[in-house]
């Protein structure tokens, strides 16, 4: 079993990637900052299904915070990092 880190795990793509990895028998650590750019209740709903899985754990953290990011990586090693965290719908 490989341990995956999935950032942006409460988003649509992140939650579905995490679910697929769990179905394939892997351990998944999810990170998301649960910002209010769009409904945090929707993000928490997606997380609720993942949190029911025994091989899933979640850390609420902002990857823009260097200390929080360092803590995620110092807590345990990962075989694979899937970085999906982003500000959705940003237009400049």
Residue spans for each PLM region:
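N-terminal Rossmann-like NAD(P)+-binding domain of SDR-like oxidoreductases, especially those catalyzing
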Residues: 1-92
